[in-house]
Amino acid sequence: MGSSQSVEIPGGGTEGYHVLRVQENSPGHRAGLEPFFDFIVSINGSRLNKDNDTLKDLLKANVEKPVKMLIYSSKTLELREASVTPSNLWGGQGLLGVSIRFCSFDGANENVWHVLEVESNSPAALAGLRPHSDYIIGADTVMNESEDLFSLIETHEAKPLKLYVYNTDTDNCREVIITPNSAWGGEGSLGCGIGYGYLHRIPTRPFEEGKKISLPGQMTGTPITPLKDGFTEVQLSSVSPPSLSPPGTTGVEQSLSGLSISSAPPAVSNVLSTGVPTVPLLPPQVNQSLASMPPMNPATTLPSLMPLSAGLPSLPNLPSLSNFNLPAPHIMPGVGLPELGSPGLPPLPSLPPRNLPGIAPLPMLSDFLPSFPLVPEGSSAASAGEPLSSLPAMGPPSDPVMTTAKADASSLTVDVTSPASKVPTTVEDRVSDCTPAVEKPVSDADASEPS
Protein backbone atom coordinates (compact mmCIF):
# COMPACT_ATOMS: atom_id res chain seq x y z
CA MET A 1 0.00 0.00 0.00
CA GLY A 2 1.12 3.51 -0.55
CA SER A 3 2.42 5.33 2.50
CA SER A 4 0.85 8.68 1.60
CA GLN A 5 -1.45 10.22 -0.95
CA SER A 6 0.06 11.46 -4.21
CA VAL A 7 -2.50 14.25 -4.68
CA GLU A 8 -3.33 17.21 -2.49
CA ILE A 9 -6.56 16.88 -0.54
CA PRO A 10 -8.73 20.02 -0.65
CA GLY A 11 -8.61 21.47 2.85
CA GLY A 12 -5.41 19.56 3.71
CA GLY A 13 -4.86 16.66 6.04
CA THR A 14 -4.59 12.91 5.58
CA GLU A 15 -7.75 11.86 7.42
CA GLY A 16 -11.21 10.83 6.32
CA TYR A 17 -13.97 8.31 6.81
CA HIS A 18 -12.72 4.90 5.89
CA VAL A 19 -15.29 2.74 4.07
CA LEU A 20 -15.23 -0.75 5.60
CA ARG A 21 -18.34 -2.39 4.19
CA VAL A 22 -20.82 -1.62 1.41
CA GLN A 23 -24.24 -3.29 1.37
CA GLU A 24 -25.73 -4.60 -1.82
CA ASN A 25 -28.11 -2.25 -3.70
CA SER A 26 -27.44 0.56 -1.20
CA PRO A 27 -26.95 4.22 -2.18
CA GLY A 28 -23.22 3.78 -1.44
CA HIS A 29 -23.05 0.71 -3.67
CA ARG A 30 -24.70 2.61 -6.54
CA ALA A 31 -22.20 5.46 -6.07
CA GLY A 32 -19.34 2.99 -6.60
CA LEU A 33 -17.82 3.06 -3.12
CA GLU A 34 -15.10 0.43 -2.70
CA PRO A 35 -14.57 -1.16 0.70
CA PHE A 36 -11.27 -0.67 2.47
CA PHE A 37 -9.66 1.44 -0.28
CA ASP A 38 -12.06 4.42 -0.37
CA PHE A 39 -12.03 7.36 2.04
CA ILE A 40 -14.82 9.95 2.12
CA VAL A 41 -13.00 13.28 2.53
CA SER A 42 -15.75 15.84 1.79
CA ILE A 43 -19.46 16.21 1.00
CA ASN A 44 -20.72 19.22 -0.97
CA GLY A 45 -17.36 20.92 -0.41
CA SER A 46 -17.31 20.43 3.38
CA ARG A 47 -14.00 18.88 4.48
CA LEU A 48 -14.44 15.90 6.81
CA ASN A 49 -11.16 16.03 8.76
CA LYS A 50 -12.57 15.54 12.28
CA ASP A 51 -14.37 12.70 13.99
CA ASN A 52 -17.66 14.43 14.79
CA ASP A 53 -21.30 14.52 13.64
CA THR A 54 -20.66 16.64 10.54
CA LEU A 55 -21.15 13.70 8.17
CA LYS A 56 -24.43 12.63 9.80
CA ASP A 57 -25.79 16.15 9.75
CA LEU A 58 -24.98 16.64 6.07
CA LEU A 59 -26.64 13.34 5.11
CA LYS A 60 -29.79 14.02 7.14
CA ALA A 61 -30.09 17.45 5.56
CA ASN A 62 -29.97 15.94 2.06
CA VAL A 63 -32.23 12.91 2.30
CA GLU A 64 -33.51 11.89 -1.13
CA LYS A 65 -31.34 14.61 -2.63
CA PRO A 66 -28.18 14.01 -4.63
CA VAL A 67 -24.99 15.30 -3.02
CA LYS A 68 -21.43 15.53 -4.34
CA MET A 69 -18.96 13.34 -2.53
CA LEU A 70 -15.16 13.59 -2.87
CA ILE A 71 -13.48 10.22 -2.44
CA TYR A 72 -9.79 9.36 -2.08
CA SER A 73 -8.65 5.89 -3.18
CA SER A 74 -5.62 4.37 -1.53
CA LYS A 75 -5.41 1.84 -4.35
CA THR A 76 -5.09 4.30 -7.24
CA LEU A 77 -3.78 7.19 -5.06
CA GLU A 78 -6.27 9.47 -6.78
CA LEU A 79 -9.24 11.66 -5.92
CA ARG A 80 -12.55 11.19 -7.66
CA GLU A 81 -15.96 12.79 -7.39
CA ALA A 82 -19.17 10.77 -7.09
CA SER A 83 -22.86 11.58 -6.72
CA VAL A 84 -24.86 9.82 -3.99
CA THR A 85 -28.46 10.19 -2.80
CA PRO A 86 -29.04 9.47 0.90
CA SER A 87 -32.24 7.48 1.36
CA ASN A 88 -34.23 5.54 3.93
CA LEU A 89 -36.25 3.69 1.31
CA TRP A 90 -33.62 1.54 -0.34
CA GLY A 91 -34.43 -1.42 1.99
CA GLY A 92 -31.43 -1.56 4.31
CA GLN A 93 -29.83 0.13 7.30
CA GLY A 94 -28.44 3.63 7.17
CA LEU A 95 -28.79 6.46 4.69
CA LEU A 96 -25.86 5.26 2.59
CA GLY A 97 -25.76 1.57 3.54
CA VAL A 98 -22.03 1.61 4.35
CA SER A 99 -19.90 0.97 7.43
CA ILE A 100 -17.31 3.68 8.07
CA ARG A 101 -14.71 4.71 10.64
CA PHE A 102 -12.62 7.86 10.97
CA CYS A 103 -8.88 7.30 10.56
CA SER A 104 -5.87 8.42 8.59
CA PHE A 105 -4.96 7.03 5.22
CA ASP A 106 -1.66 5.63 6.42
CA GLY A 107 -3.10 4.07 9.57
CA ALA A 108 -5.75 2.19 7.60
CA ASN A 109 -3.16 0.74 5.25
CA GLU A 110 -0.89 -0.34 8.10
CA ASN A 111 -3.52 -2.10 10.20
CA VAL A 112 -3.84 -5.13 7.93
CA TRP A 113 -3.46 -8.78 8.92
CA HIS A 114 -2.37 -11.15 6.17
CA VAL A 115 -3.80 -14.68 6.23
CA LEU A 116 -0.98 -17.15 5.56
CA GLU A 117 -1.23 -20.95 5.79
CA VAL A 118 -4.65 -22.36 6.63
CA GLU A 119 -4.86 -25.78 8.29
CA SER A 120 -7.51 -28.20 7.13
CA ASN A 121 -10.56 -28.65 9.39
CA SER A 122 -9.54 -25.57 11.39
CA PRO A 123 -11.90 -22.71 12.38
CA ALA A 124 -10.26 -20.57 9.68
CA ALA A 125 -10.87 -23.22 7.02
CA LEU A 126 -14.49 -23.70 8.13
CA ALA A 127 -15.03 -19.92 7.94
CA GLY A 128 -13.76 -19.86 4.36
CA LEU A 129 -10.50 -17.94 4.82
CA ARG A 130 -8.21 -18.30 1.80
CA PRO A 131 -4.44 -18.64 2.31
CA HIS A 132 -2.14 -15.85 1.09
CA SER A 133 -4.87 -13.96 -0.77
CA ASP A 134 -7.06 -12.90 2.18
CA TYR A 135 -6.36 -9.81 4.29
CA ILE A 136 -8.25 -9.04 7.50
CA ILE A 137 -8.91 -5.29 7.32
CA GLY A 138 -11.23 -4.76 10.28
CA ALA A 139 -13.98 -5.89 12.58
CA ASP A 140 -16.99 -4.38 14.33
CA THR A 141 -14.58 -2.74 16.77
CA VAL A 142 -11.73 -0.43 15.86
CA MET A 143 -8.32 -2.09 15.64
CA ASN A 144 -5.35 0.27 15.53
CA GLU A 145 -2.48 -2.02 16.61
CA SER A 146 -1.26 -5.49 15.77
CA GLU A 147 -2.31 -6.92 19.13
CA ASP A 148 -5.88 -5.68 18.79
CA LEU A 149 -6.84 -8.58 16.52
CA PHE A 150 -5.37 -11.22 18.83
CA SER A 151 -7.05 -9.64 21.85
CA LEU A 152 -10.33 -9.68 19.96
CA ILE A 153 -9.90 -13.37 19.13
CA GLU A 154 -9.21 -14.25 22.78
CA THR A 155 -12.34 -12.45 23.98
CA HIS A 156 -14.43 -14.33 21.40
CA GLU A 157 -13.35 -17.85 22.35
CA ALA A 158 -16.16 -20.21 21.23
CA LYS A 159 -18.18 -17.18 20.13
CA PRO A 160 -18.93 -15.97 16.58
CA LEU A 161 -16.70 -13.10 15.42
CA LYS A 162 -17.37 -10.92 12.40
CA LEU A 163 -14.31 -9.90 10.37
CA TYR A 164 -13.98 -7.79 7.23
CA VAL A 165 -11.73 -9.57 4.76
CA TYR A 166 -10.32 -8.32 1.48
CA ASN A 167 -9.23 -10.77 -1.21
CA THR A 168 -6.63 -9.82 -3.81
CA ASP A 169 -7.85 -12.40 -6.33
CA THR A 170 -11.42 -11.14 -6.44
CA ASP A 171 -10.50 -7.52 -5.56
CA ASN A 172 -13.45 -7.33 -3.20
CA CYS A 173 -14.27 -7.22 0.50
CA ARG A 174 -16.56 -9.64 2.31
CA GLU A 175 -17.78 -10.45 5.78
CA VAL A 176 -16.46 -13.60 7.42
CA ILE A 177 -18.03 -15.15 10.53
CA ILE A 178 -15.43 -17.17 12.41
CA THR A 179 -15.64 -18.93 15.78
CA PRO A 180 -12.25 -19.16 17.55
CA ASN A 181 -11.73 -22.54 19.22
CA SER A 182 -8.44 -23.53 20.85
CA ALA A 183 -9.63 -27.16 21.15
CA TRP A 184 -10.15 -27.75 17.44
CA GLY A 185 -7.25 -30.25 17.36
CA GLY A 186 -4.40 -28.10 16.10
CA GLU A 187 -2.34 -25.05 16.98
CA GLY A 188 -3.94 -21.71 17.79
CA SER A 189 -7.56 -20.69 18.06
CA LEU A 190 -8.04 -20.05 14.33
CA GLY A 191 -5.72 -22.65 12.78
CA CYS A 192 -4.05 -20.23 10.36
CA GLY A 193 -0.92 -18.12 10.17
CA ILE A 194 -1.26 -14.34 10.53
CA GLY A 195 1.26 -11.87 9.10
CA TYR A 196 1.48 -8.23 10.12
CA GLY A 197 3.79 -5.45 9.04
CA TYR A 198 5.24 -3.78 5.99
CA LEU A 199 5.74 -7.02 4.05
CA HIS A 200 2.14 -8.09 4.64
CA ARG A 201 0.26 -5.07 3.37
CA ILE A 202 -2.18 -5.15 0.51
CA PRO A 203 -0.54 -4.36 -2.84
CA THR A 204 -1.34 -0.88 -4.09
CA ARG A 205 -2.07 -2.08 -7.62
CA PRO A 206 -3.20 -5.71 -7.68
CA PHE A 207 -3.16 -7.57 -10.94
CA GLU A 208 -6.30 -7.02 -12.98
CA GLU A 209 -7.97 -10.25 -14.03
CA GLY A 210 -8.47 -10.57 -17.76
CA LYS A 211 -5.71 -8.10 -18.58
CA LYS A 212 -3.90 -8.98 -21.79
CA ILE A 213 -0.15 -9.45 -21.59
CA SER A 214 1.85 -8.88 -24.76
CA LEU A 215 4.25 -11.67 -25.61
CA PRO A 216 7.74 -11.00 -27.05
CA GLY A 217 6.60 -11.86 -30.58
CA GLN A 218 3.59 -9.56 -30.42
CA MET A 219 5.32 -6.24 -29.89
CA THR A 220 4.08 -3.37 -31.96
CA GLY A 221 5.73 -0.16 -32.97
CA THR A 222 3.25 2.05 -31.12
CA PRO A 223 4.90 4.65 -28.88
CA ILE A 224 4.74 4.20 -25.12
CA THR A 225 2.43 6.70 -23.44
CA PRO A 226 2.87 7.60 -19.76
CA LEU A 227 0.05 6.96 -17.32
CA LYS A 228 -1.75 9.62 -15.38
CA ASP A 229 0.30 9.09 -12.24
CA GLY A 230 3.57 9.65 -14.07
CA PHE A 231 4.58 5.99 -14.38
CA THR A 232 5.22 4.36 -17.70
CA GLU A 233 4.28 0.83 -18.65
CA VAL A 234 7.31 -1.24 -19.60
CA GLN A 235 6.76 -4.47 -21.49
CA LEU A 236 8.86 -7.34 -20.18
CA SER A 237 10.21 -8.73 -23.41
CA SER A 238 13.35 -10.50 -24.51
CA VAL A 239 13.47 -8.38 -27.69
CA SER A 240 15.76 -5.45 -27.03
CA PRO A 241 15.17 -2.13 -28.80
CA PRO A 242 17.80 -0.90 -31.25
CA SER A 243 20.63 0.75 -29.40
CA LEU A 244 21.90 4.17 -30.34
CA SER A 245 25.48 3.72 -31.46
CA PRO A 246 27.83 6.29 -32.96
CA PRO A 247 28.28 6.23 -36.74
CA GLY A 248 31.83 4.95 -36.44
CA THR A 249 30.78 1.60 -35.02
CA THR A 250 28.46 0.72 -37.91
CA GLY A 251 31.22 -0.79 -40.04
CA VAL A 252 32.56 -2.84 -37.14
CA GLU A 253 29.11 -4.24 -36.41
CA GLN A 254 28.66 -5.16 -40.07
CA SER A 255 32.00 -6.93 -40.19
CA LEU A 256 31.25 -8.80 -36.99
CA SER A 257 27.86 -9.83 -38.31
CA GLY A 258 29.58 -11.68 -41.14
CA LEU A 259 31.45 -13.95 -38.76
CA SER A 260 30.06 -17.45 -38.39
CA ILE A 261 30.56 -19.82 -35.52
CA SER A 262 31.10 -23.41 -36.57
CA SER A 263 31.06 -26.47 -34.37
CA ALA A 264 33.65 -28.27 -36.56
CA PRO A 265 37.23 -28.16 -35.24
CA PRO A 266 39.41 -25.73 -37.19
CA ALA A 267 42.33 -26.99 -39.26
CA VAL A 268 45.67 -26.85 -37.49
CA SER A 269 48.08 -24.53 -39.22
CA ASN A 270 51.74 -25.31 -39.83
CA VAL A 271 52.63 -22.42 -37.60
CA LEU A 272 52.01 -24.62 -34.57
CA SER A 273 55.05 -26.83 -35.34
CA THR A 274 57.54 -23.96 -35.59
CA GLY A 275 57.38 -22.84 -31.99
CA VAL A 276 55.64 -19.56 -32.80
CA PRO A 277 53.04 -18.61 -30.14
CA THR A 278 49.54 -19.50 -31.25
CA VAL A 279 47.64 -16.26 -31.70
CA PRO A 280 44.37 -15.61 -33.50
CA LEU A 281 44.84 -15.11 -37.23
CA LEU A 282 44.36 -11.52 -38.26
CA PRO A 283 42.52 -10.34 -41.36
CA PRO A 284 44.65 -9.88 -44.52
CA GLN A 285 44.63 -6.10 -44.30
CA VAL A 286 45.98 -6.29 -40.76
CA ASN A 287 48.70 -8.73 -41.79
CA GLN A 288 49.80 -6.39 -44.57
CA SER A 289 50.02 -3.48 -42.18
CA LEU A 290 52.03 -5.55 -39.73
CA ALA A 291 54.39 -6.73 -42.47
CA SER A 292 55.27 -3.16 -43.38
CA MET A 293 56.37 -2.34 -39.85
CA PRO A 294 60.17 -2.28 -39.29
CA PRO A 295 61.60 -4.91 -36.95
CA MET A 296 62.18 -3.85 -33.38
CA ASN A 297 65.32 -4.55 -31.42
CA PRO A 298 64.61 -5.20 -27.75
CA ALA A 299 68.12 -4.13 -26.82
CA THR A 300 67.54 -0.63 -28.16
CA THR A 301 63.94 -0.23 -27.09
CA LEU A 302 64.09 -1.77 -23.64
CA PRO A 303 66.92 -0.35 -21.51
CA SER A 304 66.57 -3.04 -18.83
CA LEU A 305 67.41 -5.89 -21.22
CA MET A 306 71.01 -6.78 -22.12
CA PRO A 307 71.77 -7.39 -25.79
CA LEU A 308 72.24 -11.01 -26.73
CA SER A 309 74.76 -12.29 -29.24
CA ALA A 310 73.62 -13.81 -32.50
CA GLY A 311 74.47 -17.35 -31.41
CA LEU A 312 75.72 -19.44 -28.54
CA PRO A 313 79.41 -19.08 -27.53
CA SER A 314 81.69 -21.59 -29.20
CA LEU A 315 82.87 -24.44 -27.04
CA PRO A 316 86.58 -25.41 -26.87
CA ASN A 317 87.75 -28.15 -29.15
CA LEU A 318 87.24 -31.50 -27.53
CA PRO A 319 89.96 -34.17 -27.81
CA SER A 320 89.27 -37.06 -30.04
CA LEU A 321 87.50 -39.83 -28.20
CA SER A 322 88.64 -42.52 -30.60
CA ASN A 323 91.92 -43.09 -28.68
CA PHE A 324 90.25 -43.64 -25.35
CA ASN A 325 90.45 -47.13 -23.96
CA LEU A 326 88.03 -48.49 -21.44
CA PRO A 327 89.89 -50.02 -18.49
CA ALA A 328 89.16 -53.54 -17.49
CA PRO A 329 86.60 -53.92 -14.75
CA HIS A 330 88.92 -55.79 -12.37
CA ILE A 331 91.41 -52.85 -12.36
CA MET A 332 88.76 -50.41 -11.05
CA PRO A 333 87.11 -52.10 -8.11
CA GLY A 334 84.29 -50.11 -6.55
CA VAL A 335 83.70 -47.88 -9.60
CA GLY A 336 80.17 -48.19 -10.97
CA LEU A 337 78.42 -47.52 -14.26
CA PRO A 338 74.87 -46.25 -14.30
CA GLU A 339 72.28 -48.37 -15.95
CA LEU A 340 72.73 -48.33 -19.71
CA GLY A 341 69.07 -48.95 -20.36
CA SER A 342 67.50 -46.46 -22.72
CA PRO A 343 64.02 -46.24 -24.19
CA GLY A 344 65.52 -46.50 -27.69
CA LEU A 345 68.11 -49.29 -27.07
CA PRO A 346 67.41 -53.00 -26.60
CA PRO A 347 68.43 -54.52 -23.27
CA LEU A 348 71.83 -56.23 -23.04
CA PRO A 349 71.71 -60.01 -23.07
CA SER A 350 72.93 -61.78 -20.00
CA LEU A 351 76.26 -63.65 -20.27
CA PRO A 352 77.04 -66.93 -18.54
CA PRO A 353 79.32 -66.70 -15.51
CA ARG A 354 82.98 -67.34 -16.08
CA ASN A 355 84.81 -69.16 -13.30
CA LEU A 356 88.58 -69.36 -13.61
CA PRO A 357 90.65 -71.68 -11.48
CA GLY A 358 92.62 -70.00 -8.79
CA ILE A 359 90.68 -66.75 -8.65
CA ALA A 360 87.37 -65.76 -7.26
CA PRO A 361 84.42 -66.17 -9.64
CA LEU A 362 83.51 -63.06 -11.55
CA PRO A 363 80.03 -61.63 -11.12
CA MET A 364 77.53 -61.60 -13.93
CA LEU A 365 78.06 -58.90 -16.55
CA SER A 366 74.53 -57.67 -15.98
CA ASP A 367 75.34 -57.26 -12.29
CA PHE A 368 78.36 -54.98 -12.53
CA LEU A 369 77.56 -53.08 -15.75
CA PRO A 370 74.98 -50.83 -14.03
CA SER A 371 77.63 -49.80 -11.50
CA PHE A 372 79.99 -48.24 -14.06
CA PRO A 373 79.88 -44.53 -14.88
CA LEU A 374 78.44 -43.33 -18.15
CA VAL A 375 81.27 -43.10 -20.70
CA PRO A 376 80.96 -41.35 -24.06
CA GLU A 377 81.37 -43.33 -27.23
CA GLY A 378 85.01 -44.42 -27.68
CA SER A 379 87.24 -47.20 -28.92
CA SER A 380 86.37 -50.77 -28.00
CA ALA A 381 90.04 -51.71 -27.53
CA ALA A 382 90.81 -51.38 -23.84
CA SER A 383 94.16 -52.17 -22.29
CA ALA A 384 94.01 -54.02 -19.02
CA GLY A 385 97.27 -52.62 -17.74
CA GLU A 386 96.84 -48.96 -18.73
CA PRO A 387 96.67 -46.75 -15.65
CA LEU A 388 93.89 -44.22 -15.20
CA SER A 389 96.32 -41.33 -15.06
CA SER A 390 97.13 -41.81 -18.72
CA LEU A 391 93.63 -40.77 -19.74
CA PRO A 392 93.59 -37.22 -21.05
CA ALA A 393 91.28 -34.71 -19.43
CA MET A 394 88.00 -34.36 -21.21
CA GLY A 395 86.24 -31.06 -21.67
CA PRO A 396 82.52 -30.56 -21.52
CA PRO A 397 80.60 -32.15 -24.37
CA SER A 398 79.48 -29.91 -27.17
CA ASP A 399 75.87 -30.92 -26.68
CA PRO A 400 74.96 -32.67 -23.42
CA VAL A 401 71.57 -33.62 -24.74
CA MET A 402 72.89 -35.39 -27.84
CA THR A 403 75.67 -37.28 -25.98
CA THR A 404 74.80 -40.92 -25.65
CA ALA A 405 76.50 -43.68 -23.79
CA LYS A 406 77.01 -46.73 -25.92
CA ALA A 407 78.59 -49.70 -24.21
CA ASP A 408 78.79 -53.23 -25.36
CA ALA A 409 80.14 -56.39 -23.89
CA SER A 410 82.86 -56.40 -26.58
CA SER A 411 84.29 -53.11 -25.22
CA LEU A 412 85.20 -54.80 -21.98
CA THR A 413 88.25 -57.13 -21.77
CA VAL A 414 88.64 -59.66 -19.03
CA ASP A 415 92.10 -60.81 -18.00
CA VAL A 416 92.17 -64.52 -18.71
CA THR A 417 95.88 -65.07 -17.99
CA SER A 418 96.67 -68.54 -16.77
CA PRO A 419 96.48 -68.91 -13.05
CA ALA A 420 99.99 -70.36 -12.87
CA SER A 421 101.58 -67.05 -13.82
CA LYS A 422 99.38 -65.08 -11.53
CA VAL A 423 99.46 -67.13 -8.36
CA PRO A 424 103.14 -66.60 -7.53
CA THR A 425 102.83 -62.91 -7.97
CA THR A 426 99.95 -62.87 -5.62
CA VAL A 427 101.83 -64.99 -3.10
CA GLU A 428 104.89 -62.78 -3.30
CA ASP A 429 102.81 -59.71 -2.76
CA ARG A 430 101.21 -61.27 0.24
CA VAL A 431 104.61 -62.29 1.67
CA SER A 432 106.02 -58.83 1.20
CA ASP A 433 103.09 -57.36 2.95
CA CYS A 434 103.52 -59.60 5.97
CA THR A 435 104.98 -58.17 9.19
CA PRO A 436 108.73 -58.97 9.59
CA ALA A 437 109.70 -61.46 12.29
CA VAL A 438 110.95 -60.09 15.59
CA GLU A 439 114.62 -60.68 16.05
CA LYS A 440 115.61 -62.01 19.48
CA PRO A 441 119.08 -61.01 20.70
CA VAL A 442 121.36 -63.90 21.60
CA SER A 443 123.53 -63.56 24.67
CA ASP A 444 126.85 -65.18 25.27
CA ALA A 445 125.23 -67.57 27.57
CA ASP A 446 122.77 -68.60 24.99
CA ALA A 447 125.41 -68.84 22.33
CA SER A 448 127.41 -71.45 24.12
CA GLU A 449 125.97 -74.85 23.82
CA PRO A 450 125.75 -76.95 26.93
CA SER A 451 128.26 -79.69 27.18
Swiss-Prot record:
It comes from the Eukaryota. GO terms for cellular component: endoplasmic reticulum membrane; Golgi apparatus; Golgi membrane. Residues 236-255, 377-451 are annotated as: Disordered. One of its GO terms (biological process) is response to endoplasmic reticulum stress. Residues 15-215 are annotated as: GRASP. Myristoylated. Myristoylation is essential for the Golgi targeting. Palmitoylated. Belongs to the GORASP family. This is Golgi reassembly-stacking protein 2. It comes from Mus musculus (Mouse).
